[in-house]
Amino acid sequence: AEVRRLASWFNDKFFAEASGPLVNERFYKRHMRIEQGGGPPDTDAIRAARVNVRYHLAYIGWLVSTRDWLAGDSMSFADLAAAAHLSAVDYLGDVPWAEDEAAKAWYARVKSRPSFRPLLSEWLAGVPASRTYVDLDF
């Protein structure tokens, strides 16, 4: 139940509050026509999403300070869901890793796994990745 709860948290709540708005405003809108919702980024939406990232990062930090992985003693779909959303935000350079060492250490463990590395080789056209995105020891 905890795996499903946390996977839903990141796939629904984190996406709606953080990763979705950041990727939409900073990437998708520049490739969309005005009638499709394209145009300049909404800086208020970006600012709000960045604030929300901080709250979610603190939650991840709290979870992994009380358990080995997000949902318990072993890596699960919850870790993969959270890390996938965080990787999109990290790509854009919008994760304040210095604010939560426990969350940072957890993410470093996830992205160091061979099964996660293919995700880190994906690039967005015209948008360079942040310094921490591919660095396993950031």
Question: What positions do the PLM features span?
Answer:
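Glycine-rich, aromatic-flanked loop segments that form ligand/cofactor-binding clefts
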Residues: 7, 11
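Short loop/turn and capping residues at structural boundaries
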Residues: 18, 121-122
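Short, structured secondary-structure boundary patches
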Residues: 36-40, 119-120, 138
